């Protein structure tokens, strides 16, 4: 079956408010579907009806936004909030199409992949207008999900300040704004790290870099407001005794160095290579008390959490305690949160442009600290970053205090 065949269609649509065209009633769009067979298999795999998909992305308003959009940090959301649309360069479309066969096999075999699913690659060109390339992805933050904070993280703070990107009126923050660690269930952490490794291996083999971890934080029990405006909490798990005896006292963890919080966030967990040993020890610990029915149920649940590869919603609604080190005072704050995570922006290869950018930035900064690096280095650093911000609760936490 040919997964990379391209289909061209011409559709008639309103020209109202479309850039590059004079006002009028009707125009024609040259619409191109790249690899419809391959992306059709992905849509079928994820339970997406193709006709509904086309109706979602071919509305007047959506086409208007796409046709007048800019390349780069621009996201649009379909009217039904099901799909995220990103305008791409032609070279980025090419990277996506070249990866498609292996990408499909990967998400078919690893159903709990953290990849934001790519459902289609298209281009539209109004009659007399400019051709626009774009990809359509799953919207992990659909209209029923409110997040207090949204981060786009690459694992390198160099040049990663916020540039006022917005998704559904939520400002997307970057690495330099990130000051959290997350304490999650040990098996959940192991599965996150293991799946990140599997996903990064594919991207590394395809020569892709510059991807991100999208992290949405939702304060538990709150549907509105900012995380900054909420009172810190300890979370659903009991804090260590040192916390209980002195819960109102601020916990100082930072030195006078202004970069202390960044260091803490990037180096507060064991190395990812110890995950397999952790997993076996955790399972033994959980299952050791077989006399307790609650423990047996918990062991079954946690084993399923880690081993069940058919969980396509993995990465959504992960309960966690968030530890935040404030940059101004170095004090710790704790929040009870629900996490939404996914790997996004898998469109950039390490081509000539990125190689030149790497050389230029290496003159200014440490070559290992910039985001533009060889895919193998990028993959390793990205995995280390993920393992350093996701921590198992209780054991790691108790050992620190």
From Swiss-Prot:
Its EC number is 2.7.1.68. Residues 242-260 have a biased composition (Polar residues). Residues 242-268 are annotated as: Disordered. InterPro entries: PInositol-4-P-4/5-kinase_C_sf, PInositol-4-P-4/5-kinase_core, PInositol-4-P-5-kinase_N, PInositol-4/5-P-5/4-kinase. Residues 350-371 are annotated as: Activation loop. Residues 1-390 form the PIPK domain. This is Putative phosphatidylinositol 4-phosphate 5-kinase 11. It comes from Arabidopsis thaliana (Mouse-ear cress).
């Amino acid at each position: 079956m040919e997964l990379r065949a391209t289909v061209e269609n011409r559709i008639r649509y309103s020209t109202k408010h479309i850039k590059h065209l004079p006002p009028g009633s009707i125009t024609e769009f040259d619409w191109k579907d790249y690899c419809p067979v391959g992306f059709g298999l992905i849509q079928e795999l994820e339970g997406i009806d193709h006709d509904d998909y086309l109706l979602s992305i071919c509305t007047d308003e959506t086409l208007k936004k796409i046709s007048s959009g800019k390349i780069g940090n621009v996201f649009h959301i379909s009217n039904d909030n099901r799909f995220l649309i990103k305008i791409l360069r032609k070279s980025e479309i090419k990277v996506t199409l070249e990866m498609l066969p292996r990408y499909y096999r990967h998400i078919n075999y690893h159903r709990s992949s953290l990849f934001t699913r790519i459902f289609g690659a298209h281009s539209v060109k109004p009659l007399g207008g400019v051709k626009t390339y774009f990809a359509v992805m799953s919207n992990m933050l659909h209209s029923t999900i409110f997040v207090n904070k949204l981060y786009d993280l690459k694992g390198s703070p160099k040049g990663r300040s916020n540039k006022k990107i917005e998704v559904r009126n939520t400002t997307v923050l970057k690495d330099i704004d990130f000051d959290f660690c997350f304490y999650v269930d040990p098996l959940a952490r192991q599965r996150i790290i293991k799946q990140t490794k599997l996903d990064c291996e594919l991207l590394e083999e395809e020569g892709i870099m510059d991807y991100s971890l999208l992290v949405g934080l939702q304060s538990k029990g709150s549907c509105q407001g900012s995380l900054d405006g909420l009172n810190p909490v300890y979370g659903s798990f009991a804090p260590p005794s040192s916390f209980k005896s002195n819960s109102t006292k601020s916990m100082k963890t930072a030195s006078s160095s202004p970069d202390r919080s960044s260091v803490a966030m990037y180096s507060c967990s064991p190395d990812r290579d110890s995950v397999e040993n952790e997993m076996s020890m955790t399972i033994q610990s959980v299952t050791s008390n077989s006399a307790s029915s609650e423990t047996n149920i918990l062991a079954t649940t946690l084993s399923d959490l880690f081993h069940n590869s058919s969980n396509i919603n993995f990465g959504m609604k992960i309960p966690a305690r968030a530890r935040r080190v404030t940059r101004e005072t170095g004090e710790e704050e704790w929040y009870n949160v629900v996490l939404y995570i996914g790997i996004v922006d898998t469109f950039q290869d390490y081509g000539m442009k990125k190689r030149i950018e790497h050389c230029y930035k290496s003159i200014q900064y440490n070559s290992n600290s910039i985001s533009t690096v060889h895919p193998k280095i990028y993959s390793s650093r990205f995995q280390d970053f993920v393992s350093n911000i996701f921590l198992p609760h209780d054991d790691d936490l108790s050992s620190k205090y």
